[in-house]
Design a protein with these regions (language model features):
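Non-transmembrane, aqueous-exposed alpha-helical and coiled segments at domain scale
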Residues: 1-454
Length: 454
């Protein structure tokens, strides 16, 4: 039987490219949106008719009627953050019950993960990565060290209690010795998370079964990435990266669908570039130009509120992202931010000690030595905000986009010209290939047989 259509949404830069908006725009064409990596360190912002939603764990598809949402096994779940987000959605009138499923194999973030991360980030002499201090990294460390607690384990009260008691003994000792941290109380932690487990239980399912059965029945799935290519644990600017596989390859391992089920990879890039926290950023600019980009683009973290570092679009980086992810379509966001510029520099290559490179260095130290090579393109000095057709864009804006397309290895399928859901243009070829009516919703009534956690 032919599987339903699939697409992965992946960030091509250092995150904050606008993935949440794009998932929201496209989600009405898919039966399911599945999140496959990261935790509540990723803030995806969606604006619908002026109303702002910031989703950190729940996939953005939850905001579309008829679209089901899945939190996959590759995600690390903070139960309290999840329940807070569910409450926010319910209060806003969003239907989550029966529409939202959490993998029973997803790992759980507990207070000692936050304690360890905060201590490590603030320890003297340690390289500051710029984490959100929400316990993401330590939770993944426990997962890889086979010490983690999964959502299925969270629902087993005896296992939950013994895991918390054993972990608190170990983590308290480590945190006190290394960071002089105050100890955490295992009994109060167990009481709080045992109660949270009761509230989470109705959402828990074997989501790998759920997703594969939906695809087999002709349902369509969009895989929602978190963070971005250059923050990927393997392919990013290590060690200034996140702790999960946030490239397109993570969609299969992070949800339990087979790799050959992935049909399209849609890479999201801003019309310029930003980064939060430490780490190399070859095309970064400072001063008045950075302030202008930051102000026009509202470049502040959706989760932390931290100001983002700003710079010009980096084509070697985009080519790298295209190669690693197999991107076959680009979505360019925040084009309107550049409307006021007389000229728009584009990083077309790198120099290291006078030698030209057009690829991305493996070492962060190599990245820090990079001197960007720029080609300056003329600005268009006209508003693109809300423009709905490519042909209606200013000529110079069209040329800018075609240059990016020509030099980056994939076609542009969508352009975002404002923050609202409706301020988005779809190019005809992309629309013909990706946009399609959803004829059936395999999850309309309940999780399929065999999906519900025991």
């Amino acid at each position: 039987m032919k599987r339903g259509k699939t697409a992965v949404i992946v960030g091509a830069q250092w995150g904050d490219e606008g993935k949440g908006k794009i998932v929201d725009v496209l989600s009405h064409n898919f039966s399911i949106v599945a999140r496959y990596a990261g935790g509540h360190n990723a803030g995806h912002t969606v604006i619908i008719k002026g109303k702002k939603f910031v989703l950190q764990l729940v996939p953005c598809g939850v905001l579309r009627k008829g679209c089901r949402s899945v939190i996959g096994n590759g995600v690390v779940l903070d139960p309290l953050a999840f329940l807070k987000e569910v409450k926010m959605l319910r209060d806003a009138g969003v239907q989550v019950d029966g529409n939202l499923f959490v993998s029973n194999r997803a790992h759980v973030i507990l207070p000692y993960h936050r304690m360890i991360e905060m201590g490590a980030e603030n320890a003297p002499g340690r390289v500051k990565i710029g984490t959100t201090s929400r316990g993401i990294g330590p939770a993944y460390e426990d997962k890889m060290g086979r010490r983690g607690l999964r959502v299925a384990d969270l629902l087993d009260s005896k296992l939950l209690k013994s895991t918390i008691e054993n972990a608190c003994r170990e983590k308290n000792m480590i945190a006190h010795a290394l960071f002089n941290s105050e100890p955490l109380d295992a009994d109060s932690m167990y009481a709080e998370y045992a109660e949270a487990a009761k509230q989470i239980a109705p959402f828990v399912a074997d989501t790998a079964v759920l997703l594969n059965q939906a695809l087999a029945e002709g349902g369509s799935v969009m895989f929602e990435g978190a963070q971005a290519t250059m923050l990927d644990i393997d392919h990013g600017t290590y060690p200034f990266v996140t702790s999960s596989s946030c490239t397109a390859g993570g969609a299969a391992t992070g949800t339990g669908v087979p790799p050959n089920a992935i049909q399209n990879v849609i890479g999201i890039t801003k019309a310029y570039c930003t980064r939060v926290g430490g780490g190399p950023f070859p095309s970064e600019v400072e001063g008045a130009v950075a302030d202008q980009l930051r102000a026009r683009g509202n470049e502040y973290g959706a989760v932390t509120g931290r100001p983002r570092r700003c710079g010009w679009i980096d084509l070697p980086l985009l080519r790298y992202a295209q190669m690693i992810n197999g991107v076959n379509w680009w979505v360019v966001t925040k084009l309107d931010v550049l409307d006021v510029l007389d000229e728009v520099p584009v990083c077309v290559g790198y120099k290291i000690k006078g030698k030209k490179y057009d690829s991305v260095p493996a070492l962060a130290t190599g990245f820090e030595q990079v001197e960007p090579v720029y080609e300056k393109m003329p600005g268009w000095k006209k508003s693109t905000e809300g423009v709905a057709s490519f042909d209606d864009l200013p000529k110079k804006a069209q040329e800018y986009l075609r240059f990016i397309e020509r030099e980056s290895g994939a076609k542009i399928g969508m352009v975002s010209t404002g923050p609202d859901r409706d301020q988005t243009m779809l190019l005809p070829e992309f629309e013909a290939e990706i946009i399609h009516p959803v004829e059936k919703h395999p999850l309309e009534k309940a999780a399929p047989k065999g999906a519900k956690a025991k």
